[in-house]
Amino acid sequence: MSKTHLTEQKFSDFALHPKVVEALEKKGFHNCTPIQALALPLTLAGRDVAGQAQTGTGKTMAFLTSTFHYLLSHPAIADRKVNQPRALIMAPTRELAVQIHADAEPLAEATGLKLGLAYGGDGYDKQLKVLESGVDILIGTTGRLIDYAKQNHINLGAIQVVVLDEADRMYDLGFIKDIRWLFRRMPPANQRLNMLFSATLSYRVRELAFEQMNNAEYIEVEPEQKTGHRIKEELFYPSNEEKMRLLQTLIEEEWPDRAIIFANTKHRCEEIWGHLAADGHRVGLLTGDVAQKKRLRILDEFTRGDLDILVATDVAARGLHIPAVTHVFNYDLPDDCEDYVHRIGRTGRAGASGHSISLACEEYALNLPAIETYIGHSIPVSKYNPDALMTDLPKPLRLTRPRTGNGPRRTGAPRNRRRSG
């Protein structure tokens, strides 16, 4: 982490349980990020928190630290059964649930608290086997949690801590009824510690969330620009015919160490993947219909650096903790203004700098005014020379092979294609 991303406040300054501090310091976490420094004094005092902070600022460790401390500092409910978890952490996507579980594992190892994971798609029996042995902290998506609860594999009557992560996305995706169904099966709000975290929290979301919380304290860490000072933003106006060639030329010019390319549809993502894979790039594809095991493998390969480029729909835009992303390309301008913030928030994380490049084509340029109004500034426009765009491009591949790493490792220097002024 960059020192500019941290505060002078240390985890050891708080009255945290010693095992929690030990686990944090073992992982190299000594100083708090701003959202952690604001949240911990409240949660340690038993206050509910609704926290808004730009993505990549440490929200996950804020609620995990609070959760582990609370469970270690408060006895379980009397006569708690083996199928009754003590804490429930809800996430909008299975990828985010898996990531939270991975982040929680060092704390679980140090404290002896048991973790469980529940998400749809696959792994039903494997997840159930863990739950049947008893878990303290259950992390999951609402649909699978309800499934297990209806079959009495889990009972929420002993819940002491509840977390809603990426809460705005959960409401946007229509999970309000699911969330309320789960809350109705828990002890009352004043008998739990309740936390809600997200990068963006509209008044509507806060109002809905506070229905399930006990006089929550609202905390916010937000830069003057919603998009962050460390992210260089750039905008091009290509024609539809030149759009793909411009993207490939920009990739050759920028030669990003690790890039995510966002498009608005699965079909468009597959098209981009086909062009880049044919051109020898180590590229992975992440869309909603990719099998769960493959999705997790692709994310792991991208995180490890075995893939240089990830082409994704907005399923990957929220909550995933992928370090060291240097570039984000908006091949399509998103229809939702908040998705623009979340997309480019994949870069410039944890104090690092990043570069966001957006293509305002004939189809999606109409989305630009609303985006610029929402972020509070105009995106700087750059021009390109159509005659300098790449032309020696192979025929795109089709998805008849595994969707990861089809191109060889990049060993040569990038081709020199310069923009116009």
UniProtKB/Swiss-Prot annotation:
Residues 402-414 have a biased composition (Low complexity). ATP binds at A53, Q54, T55, G56, T57, G58, K59, T60. The keyword Ubl conjugation does not apply. A motif (DEAD box) lies at residues 165-168. Residues 245-390 form the Helicase C-terminal domain. It catalyses: ATP + H2O = ADP + phosphate + H(+). One of its GO terms (cellular component) is membrane. ATPase activity is stimulated by interaction with RNase E. A motif (Q motif) lies at residues 9-37. Belongs to the DEAD box helicase family. RhlB subfamily. DEAD-box RNA helicase involved in RNA degradation. Has RNA-dependent ATPase activity and unwinds double-stranded RNA. This is ATP-dependent RNA helicase RhlB.
